[in-house]
Amino acid sequence: MKDSKKNGFFSWLSSKIKKKKTIDIRQNNTDKNHDINHEDLYTKKDLLIKQDNPKKDEIDTLNDHGKDIEKAQNTKNNFFLRLKKSLKTTKKNLGDKIYQIFLSKKIDEVLFEELEEKMLLADIGINTTNRIISNLIKDVNREDLKNSEKLYFLLKRKMFNILKKVEIPLEISSHSPFVILVVGVNGTGKTTTVAKLAEKYKLEGKSIMLAAADTFRAAGIEQLQTLGKLNNIPVIAQRSGSDPAAVIFDAVKSAKSKKIDVLIIDTAGRLHNKLHLIEELKKIVRVIKKIDISAPHEKLLIIDSCNGQNTIQQTEIFHKALNLTGIIITKLDGTAKGGVVFSLADQFQIPIRYIGIGEKMQDLGHFNSQEFIESIFT
């Protein structure tokens, strides 16, 4: 760092702290999904059985409900275990290296310089990194903190808080059709993600329709049609080279007339620096609104985590054009650049709906900030 930065950024080193406060660094589990109370469920069942004339269907309903809760919890736990395995490279590149900084070290300028370096190398980004470190320094001054281990847990809490703000699951409303517009640059796994979403929502009992608006790529149309046939999901498509807005117009009208629950629109991958292609997305939105003024109800950007800080510029341009309502981060399995998730969350505060850790449908899961932190940090 430059001398000017040291004098200003770390001026806390020479200041005298008059008041000491105790800092509580215990981490509260904020994930309500872990708070399922099975005891309450079986207490109701026991009370019902003790009745003089219990109804068998009522007991069966409670039994089924208990099994559903257990199945949902097992699915959640399995995804968490796979997430931890998938983020091993990011953990090694970010979590482990940061942890080493705090081992048996005093809190001084050198510690913060090393922390800054590791965070930048992990693709957390300069703005987010500086904001986190600046806030840590303020806490050190305020609390007269001397213990580096406590400072480490305080860092984890700050990084958790950044992610918690964007942990907002996508809720499909009863509006028919609920239109999801999926956008992104080439190679992010957009079409594959569309298929995963379709299969996931179908398993939830919703009727699904897909629109193959990636008309620039014949293989993309064929891929979506094949995935639709495999899952018995209708796909609205036209020949390669057709106007994508025309495909989407037909799809929205068809979904509306057939009372489809969810319509997912796969658009062509487009470079964020090709302004005419970004303008085409605006045209697509206008076409959708001609049929349903409230649609699209969700505008999802697919982000490839392997692209690191390049995703920041992509998100900025797509968000400016469409006012994005959600993000899906793909290819977290094996990437060393998982730190970009913090940068995305901090700079844009757009809800992260899902994260992808593999090719299978079950490898697309709801984003959980607590699990993400636990998967990366010791």
Curated annotation (Swiss-Prot):
GO molecular function, one term: GTP binding
Database matches in HAMAP family: FtsY
Protein's name according to its UniProt entry: Signal recognition particle receptor FtsY
Binding-site list for GTP: 184-191, 266-270, 330-333
Disulfide bonds: none
SMART domains in the cross-refs: AAA (SM00382), SRP54 (SM00962), SRP54_N (SM00963)
Alphabetical keyword list: Cell membrane, Cytoplasm, GTP-binding, Hydrolase, Membrane, Nucleotide-binding, Receptor
Membership in a protein family: Belongs to the GTP-binding SRP family. FtsY subfamily.
Record's keyword annotation contains Lipoprotein: no
Top-level taxonomy: Bacteria, Pseudomonadati, Pseudomonadota, Gammaproteobacteria, Enterobacterales
Membrane topology classification: Peripheral membrane protein
Class of this enzyme: hydrolase
Organism, as annotated: Buchnera aphidicola subsp. Acyrthosiphon pisum (strain APS)
Function of the molecule: Involved in targeting and insertion of nascent membrane proteins into the cytoplasmic membrane. Acts as a receptor for the complex formed by the signal recognition particle (SRP) and the ribosome-nascent chain (RNC). Interaction with SRP-RNC leads to the transfer of the RNC complex to the Sec translocase for insertion into the membrane, the hydrolysis of GTP by both Ffh and FtsY, and the dissociation of the SRP-FtsY complex into the individual components.
Cellular component terms (Gene Ontology): cytoplasm; plasma membrane
Single GO biological process annotation from the record: SRP-dependent cotranslational protein targeting to membrane
Quaternary structure (record): Part of the signal recognition particle protein translocation system, which is composed of SRP and FtsY. SRP is a ribonucleoprotein composed of Ffh and a 4.5S RNA molecule.
Known EC number: 3.6.5.4
Swiss-Prot/TrEMBL catalytic activity: GTP + H2O = GDP + phosphate + H(+)
Matching InterPro entries: AAA+_ATPase, P-loop_NTPase, Signal_recog_particl_SRP54_hlx, SR_rcpt_FtsY, SRP/SRP_N, SRP54_GTPase_dom, SRP54_N_sf
